[in-house]
Amino acid sequence: FEPYIYALLKDDSAIEEVKKITAGRHGRVVKVKRAEKVKKKFLGRPIEVWKLYFTHPQDVPAIRDEIRRHSAVVDIYEYDIPFAKRYLIDKGLIPMEGDEELKMMSFDIETLYHEGEEFGTGPILMISYADEGEARVITWKKIDLPYVEVVSTEKEMIKRFLKVVKEKDPDVLITYNGDNFDFAYLKKRCEKIGIKFTLRRDGSEPKIQRMGDRFAVEVKGRIHFDLYPVIRRTINLPTYTLEAVYEAVFGTPKEKVYPEEITTAWETGEGLERVARYSMEDAKVTYELGREFFPMEAQLSRLIGQSLWDVSRSSTGNLVEWFLLRKAYERNEIAPNKPDERELARRRGGYAGGYVKEPERGLWDNIVYLDFMSLYPSIIITHNVSPDTFNREGCKEYDTAPQVGHKFCKDVQGFIPSLLGALLDERQKIKKRMKASIDPLEKKLLDYRQKAIKILANSLLPEEWIPLVENGKVRLHRIGEFVDKLMETDSELVKRNGDTEVLEVRGIRALSFDRKSKKARVMPVKAVIRHRYSGDVYEIVLGSGRRITVTEGHSLFAYGDGELREVTGGEIKAGDLLAVPRRVNLPEKKERLNLVELLRRLPEEETGDIILTIPVKGRKNFFKGMLRTLRWISGEEKRPRTARRYLEHLEGLGYVRLKKIGYEVTDREGLERYRKLYERLVEAVRYNGNKREYLVEFNAVRDVIALMPEEELRDWLVGTRNGFRMRPFVEIEEDFAKLLGYYVSEGNARKWRNQKNGWSYTVKLYNENQRVLDDMESLAERFFGRVKRGKNYIEIPRKMAYIIFENLCGTLAENKRVPEAIFTSPESVRWAFIEGYFIGDGDVHPSKRVRLSTKSELLVNGLVLLLNSLGVSAIKIRHDSGVYRVYVNEELPFTDYRKKKNAYYSHVIPKEILEETFGKVFQRSVSYEKFRELVKSEKLDGEKAKRIEWLLNGDVVLDKVLEVKKRPYEGYVYDLSVEEDENFLAGFGLLYAHNSYYGYYGYARARWYCKECAESVTAWGRDYIETTIHEIEERFGFKVLYADSVTGETEIIIKRNGKVEFVAIEELFQRVDYRIGEKEYCVLEGVEALTLDNRGRLVWKSVPYVMRHRTNKRIYRVWFTNSWYLDVTEDHSLIGYMNTSKVKPGKPLKERLVEVKPGELGESVKSLITPNRAIAHGIRVNPIAVKLWELIGLLVGDGNWGGQSNWAKYNVGLSLGLDKEEIEEKILKPLKNTGIISNYYDKSKKGDVSILSKWLARFMVRYFKDESGSKRIPEFMFNLPREYIEAFLRGLFSADGTVSLRKGVPEVRLTSVNPELSSSVRKLLWLVGVSNSMFVETNPNRYLGKESGTHSVHVRIKDKHRFAERIGFLLDRKATKLSENLGGHTSKKRAYKYDFDLVYPKKVEEIAYDGYVYDIEVEGTHRFFANGILVHNTDGFFATIPGADAETVKKKAKEFLKYINAKLPGLLELEYEGFYVRGFFVTKKKYAVIDEEGKITTRGLEIVRRDWSEIAKETQARVLEAILRHGDVEEAVRIVKDVTEKLSKYEVPPEKLVIHEQITRELKDYKATGPHVAIAKRLAARGIKIRPGTVISYIVLKGSGRIGDRAIPFDEFDPTKHRYDAEYYIENQVLPAVERILKAFGYKKEELRYQKTRQVGLGAWLKLKGKK
């Protein structure tokens, strides 16, 4: 059997040229052995290709790229299929074809373990085994139980077990994690005590081999079936202990006995019976699980065509891929290649997902479970969805997917549908051979198998450093922080399976080396990965001081047999030689610092005094003239007289091209952006006559300055208003790099409050050498002008210098870093930085080595990376007294010494390699130069020397392992997946680590992936599900409960075509574009909604559609004040804010943002979210325009205008009272002097003024009064610049606003009798970022003793500080009072650091409503502001028949199945999957049900954590029993009250209160000290050894002070001296375990304690208690 690939040629005549192509492999020439032309199919179309044969399987990877590069070759195919797999496929070999009944037997071992012991040190205490007939335990201590067999020694026990296996002779040996524990442990013990480990049928020992990041064990003549990888691939669980898996699969709990308990029992002799029972049950449940899972793996083995041993250890993605490859061969199809980067980018674009069911909360009886049989595969088959049928030309008939419109040919059957048809048939056979079709276990396993993605993650710990290239910039990250941040930002794109998460990424590259040439390069990162890990980790320390900590399965690159091979953390040992960089290749370019971009990244308050200036010379009237020209080009103005001047300027920028007559636009989009810039510039720019310059405040243009072409920007200066200014671009050349080096080594940047309450800034560079200070001074003055010089420092008192150094390099010694731009600068610039750093903080060690010192770990890694980029690899790192020292054992260009020989020098070939290569003894290592000399003189064999040629010519050197430290670890671990090279630089000091492989099918990199196919399948799926829901509701009486929607008049904040609108949601719905079930959809374009991202920032997100439907559900009105409310359906999610101790400080904001239904308000969530950040754009304003808007605000508040009189045509009136003189000076005189108003004069009433201005009178009538003559605020104001809105509000609040203190709290209100006007004022306040509320006086206003028929409406300011800062008052008396009131008042709201404020619901009530309800889809966040409150948008349902008995529900369900299946096309079929007697639903992912056999199934409610006490677990189990078995919620409440009462009275045995928590890191690394850490530190202080992995079992005692101080080890608990803290166990253990269950029935935490009186809250108003 010969290896081969396929080649498609442009011309068959070129085959002879192709056959002549050669490549090299291990010193021999590789070429095509022979070629033949064959007829194949490619995506269903006939094709003729050449089949190229080769001599050896390794010839294919050696030559394939050379063949592909040939000009006559279109492409090559099937070049990446491993030879062994190729053989199985081509020969049609199928394992597990027989139908024999296989004998199965499981086994498990218990071992003696002491903290810190090496694996296999402690003896095996018990071996248990189970088969169909019995479950027994063999041990060597006396235990009197019928199933226990006692022998004399451990050796006799193992011999007895081997004899049992031989006697029973099982075909299948079942273990749970036997690959990685039981077999390896048995093998170690057999070696130690001198027994041959004969488990194979031929009498030989099991073969233990590595497979990915794990081990795999083969037992010749038997199948070793390890359940662990099968279950990890198949079922999604929070933890994969045997106990958790057994309970998830069978619904029955299993006792857990911890290793420390086993050790104690064995050594004391007490409790051995319990350990024996536990051991027996381990074997028994492993056997039971094996019986359940083995048949499906056997069938899968037949389908895939691989052995069951392989299949059970493979990921789902790999299995599907190999199945398709086999079928493609059988059908004469060539397999498509995996996608290139361009195709991959297209595939990665998102599409709408499938339908999501949202269960109705509460307790329900008689629940039927209906499910589509293989929904997506059935759709694929029914509609012939396949890459080879998509948009296939020349077909007579097509099926078109709903909503997305993709077409699929029906004339010929597609490749994928044809295979899935056979698969579904096979699946039905499997189902018939297994349990009845309603078995939820079997259904669950098959369903998970279709969807499961298993990632094999070799991983690093979170603290490890990785250098990455992002958008051309080199950055150093801790891998945990980097991956966590990416996954938090793009959480909706993270693919999850079990406890593994994968996020595919773009635009990120890793530093790696080519596995073949060993040359360094930069390669794309395909994905970032994290997963939960519990096991051993290995800290590997190298001779150079480099170090890295990896999981047991993570590989580094070690030298062996002439090559670099992957060696796992568990295999690496002292003396191994690992790959580290000799040189790294970083992207290189001339770097330039763009100060404008740097300033744009700073907060607005940091740049408040920054200005841009440009000389007037040559630019007189330039800005206005340019804007007029741009408007003329757009057809909005006449041609300016000087247009030619501006057209020439635009031509120079590339926007237009001048002709002999006229011009043409060459860049329309660029021109539009340029105009947007000038619209703002003309508003913002002002003339400074003193300096003959134009001046612009940076903040006025910060959001448009990026639009300024570089050719223009370079003419400006940037700096502080009254201080130093500099060019906006700084070239990063040698001098600037050296100055940065000086700063990083011995500089600091500082800012402080000065005596005027402003900020002062300075940068200082220190050195004792006056010549160095001279150089520092010269460089600093070149870039920053005049500086100050002290005895041993240079001071740069410039804010711009502070900004540059602080942002590029950091400020404190502990956080200094190499500036990003230095890494990618030319080599001479990098050397200049190193020189500056060396002069500032380096020295020459007595050993003639350069020594660089720093306190910053980030800087150490940056220096090493920088030196590596310069080809310097002879580096040694040491850490002493808090200081890192980097020793460089090479001559550097700027040092004036000659390096002498030194013991540490990486540019040598280690003698161990020389001895292995040449087969003789070498006395010492040899330098590269000496080695070449020895080879050239033929003293060394030239042919043998070629084996290590890569070491001389590559970019990798070897570093010896000094020590390996092993410790346990539990927590997240991380990895990258790097394209092609499969390695990346990582760790402290940087060394090469192997990356993760991850396989998948149905994702963008799969061979047969088709984005349009996936999009169409989900669209059809949504359509069929919603149609089915509609039918079951309308025709069969099932109630459909939608989990969404708000009422039609609800106002939302949108931006349409760039303009902000406050619009009723029903007004967005203009037409019905399509229907799904009873829901109607209107597609929107150019609409964005205001929403909140997970970082707490207000952002605009696209709204693709608005949806509406009729509902018969309850509608609730949530009242915030007596006039501010929100109407929502009963189960619509609002976004609440957890402002409690339940969320620990420092946790991401998204952990505080929780979805909450109206009925849950007032329980754990008491506050909702309202916006509190400016969303109106800012400009550089005209001061007179500000005064005009202040006047308009005063008029709306205390003015009058309009009417039929002659006076009204020319005047407006303003009532000013005692404030007349102040307003006259501040507003009226300046407006009169500038001609905005003609005049003003006193009226008859004191303080009243008439303002003469014909245009103003017309303007106020046209825009500020409605048809009835009432005052209003026009909609155009919602899109005014922020400063003008603030000016208007300032005038309005000055007229009608009040300032007061109420119960010591500052109060600011605006009062009117016009609700519509007040509502508009609220919108303006939101636009400028001032949170507010509104309420109406319940008592009517009175005038002259009589009711006036009006009520006062108060707009109340929530964020008073923001109001004072941005708006304030015109009147000194009000402004002074506000300042005094706020003087001693500071807001403690944590929310104020984000873009929102909190609002507290006052009441929830049901209302009558008969109309459409609406929802919008908001991309990315799925949230929008409705009536000023943040809500969630969803789209799901859950259905049942309320009140019907079990038989009726079953009968109706089956009738419906018969009806709907007759209507569904093709293979689509709805199945009866099960029936549940009772169930309750907390949310869509948290529920519990009980079937007719009494089996309880839970999801999302399990307590499996070690750090919960037995009393918490026991109470939750009893609560579930009461609700599900007895249907009695009140009984469940009584149980909780009873437990809390017993706890309070100290009637609970202390054994049930023990909490077990593991130490996961070194004690010194803990910042927060939990109880277990506090105990561990006290134990360590006593001399007891505490390592990561140690489990602390403790109990919390009654008393005052920190919990950690009151927690003691349980073995120190003395009931005669100690009392446990009942309150702690009630509040932190028992109630949290049951609260999330019972809150579904309206109970609050305080109602579950026996001693508390019952309180009535929002939940009581909603009458949610009891069952439905």
UniProtKB/Swiss-Prot annotation:
List the InterPro entries. DNA-dir_DNA_pol_B, DNA-dir_DNA_pol_B_exonuc, DNA-dir_DNA_pol_B_multi_dom, DNA/RNA_pol_sf, DNA_pol_B_thumb, DNA_pol_palm_dom_sf, DNA_pol_type-B, Hint_dom_C
Q: Which Pfam families match?
A: DNA_pol_B (PF00136), DNA_pol_B_exo1 (PF03104), Intein_splicing (PF14890), LAGLIDADG_3 (PF14528), PI-TkoII_IV (PF18714)
Q: Does the keyword Repeat apply?
A: yes
Q: Which PROSITE patterns match?
A: INTEIN_C_TER, INTEIN_ENDONUCLEASE, INTEIN_N_TER
Gene Ontology terms, MF aspect? DNA binding; DNA-directed DNA polymerase activity; endonuclease activity; exonuclease activity; nucleotide binding
- Documented EC number(s): 2.7.7.7, 3.1.-.-
Q: Which UniProt keywords apply?
A: Autocatalytic cleavage, DNA replication, DNA-binding, DNA-directed DNA polymerase, Endonuclease, Exonuclease, Hydrolase, Intron homing, Multifunctional enzyme, Nuclease, Nucleotidyltransferase, Protein splicing, Repeat, Transferase
Consult the record and explain the modifications the protein receives after translation. This protein undergoes a protein self splicing that involves a post-translational excision of the intervening region (intein) followed by peptide ligation.
Which GO BP terms apply? DNA-templated DNA replication; intein-mediated protein splicing; intron homing
- Where would I find the DOD-type homing endonuclease domain in this sequence? 739-872, 1191-1330
**Does the keyword Cytoplasm feature in the UniProt annotation?**
no
Reaction equation(s) it catalyzes: DNA(n) + a 2'-deoxyribonucleoside 5'-triphosphate = DNA(n+1) + diphosphate
Q: Which SMART domains match?
A: HintC, HintN, POLBc
The protein's job, in short, is: In addition to polymerase activity, this DNA polymerase exhibits 3' to 5' exonuclease activity. PI-ThyI and PI-ThyII are endonucleases. PI-ThyI cleaves the inteinless sequence of the Thy DNA pol gene. It requires a 21-bp minimal recognition sequence.
Q: Which family does the record claim for this protein?
A: Belongs to the DNA polymerase type-B family.
Q: Which NCBIfam families does UniProt cross-reference here?
A: intein_Cterm, intein_Nterm, pol2
Name of protein? DNA polymerase
| Species annotation | Thermococcus hydrothermalis
